[in-house]
Design a protein with these regions (language model features):
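Extracellular glycan-recognition regions
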Residues: 8-239
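Beta-propeller blade signature
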Residues: 1-5
């Protein structure tokens, strides 16, 4: 919430009296003089517009040639990586988590990625993990204490029959399960559950990326949120 104090906007609630507002998980809807239906920000994206929805945020100031929206798909061009992990990579296309439990699924065509390039689905924070196409494999990579420059570790990998794949992350509170599939119906878990952590002031985010040298790119057909299935919640609680 925001209020005006001495002609200055004060954001959040000052619960401890130190003069600094703090974020809240719930707050009464403000009285704006008329009734409006409750609405939530857009989350899923079919990539049918000629510009990104307002829910998307680049990890740093964007460059126009990082992406292209055309023919109902998002094209992310590979951008060279200059560090041991993605903490300082500017070309991460992310959005804030919409709920405590959810799934995100995307369809990735990686047939135009070149050698040394990687593209996939990411949970970003101080610790991060992702599932991605790397050559003819699907890989799970993780970095713990990424802000300190910790290199990524390869948690798991599996060979692909082709370079188009469905990628999914199922989130239950802080537990994230990454999986992949060939038909969009049956998904195979890859690697262990990842316990997400917020990333300094930005919190934890979910999104897409494409990295590596050269002129390759990855095409994403859509990016869809859905409620977390009961089976996924049960698996997370069992860990």
């Amino acid at each position: 919430p925001m209020k005006w104090l001495n002609d200055w906007p004060v954001i959040g609630l000052d619960v401890d009296g130190d003069g600094k507002g703090e974020p809240v998980t719930e707050h009464r809807k403000p009285n704006v003089g008329r009734e409006y239906p409750a609405q939530a920000p857009q989350t899923s994206d079919e990539f049918t517009s000629n510009k990104l929805g307002l829910q998307w945020q680049w990890h740093a100031n964007p460059v126009a040639n990082w992406m292209r929206l055309s023919q109902g798909r998002l094209r992310l061009h590979a951008v060279p990586q200059n560090s041991a992990n993605l903490w300082t990579a500017p070309n991460l296309l992310l959005q804030k988590l919409p709920a405590r439990t959810f799934t995100v699924t995307t369809f990735l065509d990686g047939s135009h990625l070149r050698e040394g390039q990687r593209s996939g689905l990411l949970i970003m924070g101080r610790d991060y993990s992702y599932i991605a196409i790397d050559g003819t494999r699907v890989v799970r990579m993780t970095s713990i204490d990424a802000a300190k420059g910790t290199p990524e570790t390869n948690d798991a990998s599996v060979d692909l029959k082709n370079r188009s794949v469905f990628l999914r992350v199922s989130v239950n509170d802080a537990a994230c399960e990454f999986s992949y599939g060939g038909d969009g119906k049956k998904f195979e878990r890859l690697g262990e559950l990842f316990p997400m952590k917020p990333g300094v002031w930005i919190g934890a985010k979910v999104g897409l990326f494409s990295i590596g040298p050269g002129s390759g790119y990855a095409d994403f057909e859509w990016f869809r949120f859905a409620p977390l299935s009961q089976s996924a919640q049960t698996r997370a609680l069992a860990q």
